[in-house]
Amino acid sequence: MPKICQITKKKSMLGQNRSHAMNATKKKFSLNIQYHTFWLPEKKKKIRIRITKKGIRMINKFGISKIYKKYII
């Protein structure tokens, strides 16, 4: 399964490590993805989401019901 946040739709990105001599090596910047379980009161069930830490903060700010309706996970 690809590392994509189900809320923010962010993916890993590619870049470069640079040494002091400015030699470049390829690097993959990965996301802080975690599985998280939320309780949906209107559906009366738990949902398990693969989500980044930023997505968890969005849910804490706006509420799981509003995010669920907007993004329909």
Swiss-Prot record:
GO terms for cellular component: ribonucleoprotein complex; ribosome. The keyword Ribosomal protein applies. Gene3D superfamilies: Ribosomal protein L28/L24 (2.30.170.40). The keyword Ribonucleoprotein applies. One of its GO terms (molecular function) is structural constituent of ribosome. SUPFAM superfamilies: L28p-like. GO terms for biological process: translation. It holds the Pfam family Ribosomal_L28. Keywords: Ribonucleoprotein, Ribosomal protein. It comes from the Bacteria. Disulfide bonds: none annotated. Belongs to the bacterial ribosomal protein bL28 family. This is Large ribosomal subunit protein bL28. It comes from Buchnera aphidicola subsp. Cinara cedri (strain Cc). The gene is rpmB.
